[in-house]
C-alpha cells in the first residue's frame, strides 16, 4: 500500500512539473547562479610576513643572477678584446724587425749617389705608408733621442761619457720603440749620456734599475 502511495506522489509531482514548464516556457526557468565575488582567503599576519619575506628573497636572488649574468657578459667581452689586442701586438712586434731593416737601409742610402737616393725615395714613401697603417691601428713610434732615459720606455745598451749632454739624456737611438695605445710593445734601445769620470761597469745596470 505504501509503495502505491509513493508511486502516486511521484506521478503527481512529475505532472505538476510538466504543467509548469508548459505554462512558463523552459527558457523562463531561473536557476540560482554562483556568486560573482571571489572567494576570500584569510591569511594571518605571520603568514603574510612569511610570504613577503619569501618574495623578497626571490627578488634578491633574481637581482643577483642578473648582476652575475651582466658581469659574465662584460668579462667575456673584455677577454675577447684582450685576445684580439695581444694577437695584433704579437703580429706587430714580428713586423717591426723588417721595418727596422728597411728604415736603416734608407738611412744608409742617404750617403750614396743621387741614383741610389732616387731609388730610395720610392721606398721611403712605402715606409711612410707602413707607418701610417700602424698609426691608424693605434701603434706609434717613440721618439727617444734627446729625452731623459725612462726604464719603462727605454733599454740602455751603452753609457756614453760626454759633456755635450746632461747625464741621463739619450744621445743615440739604435732601435726605435713602439707603443700600442698606452702600452709599450717594444722598448727603444738607446745610448745614454753620463758625466765624464772613471769608467764604472755598473753604471748601465744601475741606470736601468734606479730609474
Curated annotation (Swiss-Prot):
Presence of keyword Cytoplasm: yes
One GO term of the biological process aspect: protein folding
Lineage: superkingdom: Bacteria
Transmembrane segments: none
InterPro entries the record matches: GrpE, GrpE_coiled_coil, GrpE_head
Compartments where found: Cytoplasm
Comp. bias (Basic and acidic residues): 1-13
Single GO molecular function: protein homodimerization activity
Keywords for the protein's UniProt record, in alphabetical order: Chaperone, Cytoplasm, Stress response
NCBIfam families in UniProt: PRK14140.1
Self-association and partners: Homodimer.
Name under which the protein is recorded: Protein GrpE
